[in-house]
Amino acid sequence: MGHLLSKEPRNRPSQKRPRCCSWCRRRRPLLRLPRRTPAKVPPQPAAPRSRDCFFRGPCMLCFIVHSPGAPAPAGPEEEPPLSPPPRDGAYAAASSSQHLARRYAALAAEDCAAAARRFLLSSAAAAAAAAASASSPASCCKELGLAAAAAWEQQGRSLFLASLGPVRFLGPPAAVQLFRGPTPSPAELPTPPEMVCKRKGAGVPACTPCKQPRCGGGGCGGGGGGGGGGGPAGGGASPPRPPDAGCCQAPEQPPQPLCPPPSSPTSEGAPTEAGGDAVRAGGTAPLSAQQQHECGDADCRESPENPCDCHREPPPETPDINQLPPSILLKIFSNLSLDERCLSASLVCKYWRDLCLDFQFWKQLDLSSRQQVTDELLEKIASRSQNIIEINISDCRSMSDNGVCVLAFKCPGLLRYTAYRCKQLSDTSIIAVASHCPLLQKVHVGNQDKLTDEGLKQLGSKCRELKDIHFGQCYKISDEGMIVIAKGCLKLQRIYMQENKLVTDQSVKAFAEHCPELQYVGFMGCSVTSKGVIHLTKLRNLSSLDLRHITELDNETVMEIVKRCKNLSSLNLCLNWIINDRCVEVIAKEGQNLKELYLVSCKITDYALIAIGRYSMTIETVDVGWCKEITDQGATLIAQSSKSLRYLGLMRCDKVNEVTVEQLVQQYPHITFSTVLQDCKRTLERAYQMGWTPNMSAASS
């Protein structure tokens, strides 16, 4: 009622307001007040919005009915105040009719008629009618309504205060019945609209307000007089809250008690008096218990034990790895091995299974040491992914030449083929690979007893892009097949032969003459002599040379190779008893880019180690294991003089004392000394780091 009778119009939601009676529905266009833009006024304490005018219309009839009059006559018997209506929608119409009946009962027929006559004969109405009669009847009615609003505002407020007392159900007055006509049934009455919160942030979704019991007016009131809030006088006990405070905003300071203490002597009688003072001072009267229960959007103060922030943001969603783009997941899965993808990741969900089946993971297949690999499996893999570029089937004994032929036929883009120790394969498989995969660049088929020169001839004639070959321990290969490869594959960069007794100096000469891009050459245990090795001096790009166990290799050939091959970085001369200290000294002086020198079981002494430490500034790895003439002096001097040494192999150098090695380990921690005891210690340390613990019970038993 307070906001309807105030001078400042209340901003209500844009909805059609119900008419108060049938007379208003006929005269509404003539009695509607003009809309005015409210002037900006400083914010005032928010008043409790307990209820609205039951007639819901700023018409002249509302002010006539609300005029002050004599108190209602006492009836034959008093009825107790009505209990608060239920909140259900089925009783909305009945609740509205009960409130309307109680407001009608507070007025007498004579009072309403007298009020109407007083207003119609008042000077304010006459002045308004005279001022607007010159324009039009519509403007006359409008001015009359404005005058009525100004004249009856204060009287309406007094009526509101008087209506808070006990009411009787006596029936509507005669004056009201005269204007209304037939009384509609309770079901036909319009349902009052919901109260709308007009504080700041009202449109933001908020939590359910916590309704605390209110014993006075202090819990819900925000105006000038709260009645019975906690002081002796009962007025203004709690400080006024700002009008834009949120409904459920937790207080920053300790909150005031929601209810006055039970021992307060003024908790019963003070509210009415204080409320009357507040109304006369321009404030708002305190609400009754029923009105407080019906006030849906009154300010509620949150309990400190259960704070509620109306502007709380929803909690962030739990991050899900499946929300990443597929390209990122594929990049992550690419770091997994084939076992981890097939046996772990692909079993998580269907999405991961599909990602694990992506074609890029099936370009490079490592099926080594898997006895489940059969011809049928190779056929299925080749049928599903025909873009395989690399496959490793080493130690797969359950397949045959047929599976390799199907794989080669369905994967013409194969670039790298590895099949170590597949003794069941023959020339048929290598011929199929050479025939269907012309882009082949790498062929490693070591330790295949059935491989002959026929397969090598097909490789040399059809695979012109071949760069890396490995035919170690293929005992049936001879110079015939090797020469065909040397003449047909001019882009060769790596060649490794091991224990191929049928390969002689002719093959070495052919590779040296036709393959100038060779960088890695290995003829370990082959029937090669110094006459064939000397041709390797033509290879200017040679960086790694493996001449282990070459029976007829002399020192002059080795020194000549080191002098001419300036890019040589690794030289392996193990198991050559003819290599002596003089050869090692030349190697240390001439090897400008040499970093690795392997001299296991050679005929050298401490002088070779001293020469390496004195003349070489690049050698980082030296292995002189099984050299019986190496002593503590050579190991100590090379460690002291060499600035680049990082590894010194002293395995089975029996003249080197272990105590000396322990001292060298402490003095030169940047150098790794390899002996039997030192290697055992490092192995145990790695085992401990990986979580291994010794079983003391088994050791004691």
UniProtKB/Swiss-Prot annotation:
Its main location: cytoplasm. It comes from Homo sapiens. Residues 318-365 form the F-box domain. The keyword Cell membrane does not apply. This is F-box/LRR-repeat protein 17. Gene3D superfamilies: Ribonuclease Inhibitor. It comes from the Eukaryota. The keyword Nucleus applies. Residues 252-264 have a biased composition (Pro residues). Residues 227-237 have a biased composition (Gly residues). Disulfide bonds: none annotated. Part of the SCF (SKP1-CUL1-F-box) E3 ubiquitin-protein ligase complex SCF(FBXL17) composed of CUL1, SKP1, RBX1 and FBXL17. Interacts with BTB domain-containing proteins such as KLHL12, BCL6 and BACH1; specifically recognizes and binds a conserved degron of non-consecutive residues present at the interface of BTB dimers of aberrant composition. Interacts with SUFU. Interacts with PRMT1. Belongs to the FBXL17 family. PROSITE patterns: FBOX. Keywords: Cytoplasm, Neurogenesis, Nucleus, Ubl conjugation pathway. Substrate-recognition component of the SCF(FBXL17) E3 ubiquitin ligase complex, a key component of a quality control pathway required to ensure functional dimerization of BTB domain-containing proteins (dimerization quality control, DQC). FBXL17 specifically recognizes and binds a conserved degron of non-consecutive residues present at the interface of BTB dimers of aberrant composition: aberrant BTB dimer are then ubiquitinated by the SCF(FBXL17) complex and degraded by the proteasome. One of its GO terms (biological process) is neural crest cell differentiation. Pfam families: F-box-like, LRR_6. Residues 1-20, 72-94, 227-300 are annotated as: Disordered. GO terms for cellular component: cytoplasm; nucleoplasm; nucleus; SCF ubiquitin ligase complex. Residues 1-11 have a biased composition (Basic and acidic residues). InterPro entries: F-box-like_dom_sf, F-box_dom, F-box_LRR-repeat, Leu-rich_rpt, Leu-rich_rpt_Cys-con_subtyp, LRR_dom_sf. It is found in: Cytoplasm; Nucleus.
